[in-house]
Amino acid sequence: MVFRIASSPYTHNQRQTSRIMLLVLLAAVPGIAAQLWFFGWGTLVQILLASVSALLAEALVLKLRKQSVAATLKDNSALLTGLLLAVSIPPLAPWWMVVLGTVFAVIIAKQLYGGLGQNPFNPAMIGYVVLLISFPVQMTSWLPPHEIAVNIPGFIDAIQVIFSGHTASGGDMNTLRLGIDGISQATPLDTFKTSVRAGHSVEQIMQYPIYSGILAGAGWQWVNLAWLAGGVWLLWQKAIRWHIPLSFLVTLTLCATLGWLFSPETLAAPQIHLLSGATMLGAFFILTDPVTASTTNRGRLIFGALAGLLVWLIRSFGGYPDGVAFAVLLANITVPLIDYYTRPRVYGHRKG
C-alpha cells in the first residue's frame, strides 16, 4: 500500500480572513455606539462615507490590476480600514476629508504594496496621519461630549455640517464646540497639553468641565471602556492574541505613572492616558493588525511595549496631543528587525 504524505499545514480551522475581519467589525459595535452617544450622529455619517469610499477605491484598483473584485472585497479588509479611520477623526469633519483619507489609505498604503498581506504600515493610520499633517485644524476640532455641550447637533444638523459646514440654523463648528463654560472644548489630552504650556497648574486644569468624568475625561472614559469591552470580546473569540494589548497598556501605565510621580505639575496622570484619546482603540483594534504587527510571541510583547512607550513620549513631549497613530507607524517600521531577533528556534536545532 502506498501512503501519500500531504503537504503542510497539518492543522486547520475555520478562521478565514473574512471571518476574522468580520469579528473585528462586530467587536467595534460597543465603541461606535459610545461615540454616537457622546459625540452625535456625525460618527455614523463618517463611517458610511469611509466604507463606501474604501470599497470603491479597492474595486477600482483591483479592476486596474485585473484581479477579482468580488472575491477580494469579501475579505472585509477594506471595510475595516474605512471604519478605523472614520472613528479616529472628528465626527463633524468635512466629508471630503474622510473620503480623501480613506482613498489614500486603500490605494497608496495598501494596494500600492500589493494588497492585503503585503503592506508594511497600517493603512488606516497612514490615512489618519496624512489628514492630521495636512489639515491639523479640522482634525483636532472635536465636539465636547454631550454631557458638557451647549449645542447638541441632531442627525440632520450633523449631515449639513459635514457637507456644508453649517447647520440649518446657521451655526458652525465654532458654535458647536462650545462647552457649558462658554469655552470651545478639545479632547482631554489636547486640553491638558495646551493648558500646561499656557502655564496653568494641574489643579486648575482638573477643574475644567472636560475632566468632569469619574475616572478621566467626560465622555472619553466611557468611549475607551467601550472599546476595551470590544477588545476583550476579541480575545475571548481568539481573533487576536493578548501579547500586544497587554504589553502596550502595561508599558503606557508604567511610563505615565513614573512620569506623573516625578513631575505631577507638567505630566498627565495615568488614568488620563489610559481612558482618553485612542488608547483602547489602538491597543485592541489597530496595533493587533496581523499584517503590520510582529508575528512571534516575544516580538509581540516588544512591539506592544515599544508602541506604549512611544505613545507616552509623544503625548508628554511631542507636538501632537494623542500620538497613537504615529506610535503605531513608528512601531511598524521596527517589525522586520523585531521578528528577525525573536525567531523561535527550529525544533531539533542546537545553539552553536
UniProtKB/Swiss-Prot annotation:
Keywords: Cell inner membrane, Cell membrane, Electron transport, Flavoprotein, FMN, Membrane, Phosphoprotein, Translocase, Transmembrane, Transmembrane helix, Transport
Recorded superkingdom: Bacteria
Modified-residue entries (FMN phosphoryl threonine), positions: T187
GO BP, sorted A to Z: electron transport chain; transmembrane transport
Bridged cysteine pairs (disulfide): none
A Gene Ontology cellular-component term: plasma membrane
Cell compartments where the protein resides: Cell inner membrane
InterPro entries listed in its UniProt record: NqrB/RnfD (IPR004338), RnfD_bac (IPR011303)
One Pfam family cited in the UniProt record for this chain: NQR2_RnfD_RnfE
Cofactor requirement: FMN
Membrane topology term: Multi-pass membrane protein
E.C. code: 7.-.-.-
The UniProt record lists the keyword Lipid metabolism: no
UniProt main location, coarse: membrane
Transmembrane regions listed in the UniProt entry: 20-40, 42-62, 78-109, 123-143, 148-168, 214-234, 242-262, 267-287, 301-321, 322-342
Quaternary structure, from the entry: The complex is composed of six subunits: RsxA, RsxB, RsxC, RsxD, RsxE and RsxG.
PANTHER family: ELECTRON TRANSPORT COMPLEX PROTEIN RNFD, ION-TRANSLOCATING OXIDOREDUCTASE COMPLEX SUBUNIT D
Family stated for the protein in its record: Belongs to the NqrB/RnfD family.
UniProt function note: Part of a membrane-bound complex that couples electron transfer with translocation of ions across the membrane. Required to maintain the reduced state of SoxR.
HAMAP family to which the protein is assigned, alphabetical: RsxD_RnfD
Protein name: Ion-translocating oxidoreductase complex subunit D
UniProt organism field: Escherichia coli O139:H28 (strain E24377A / ETEC)
Gene this chain is encoded by: rsxD
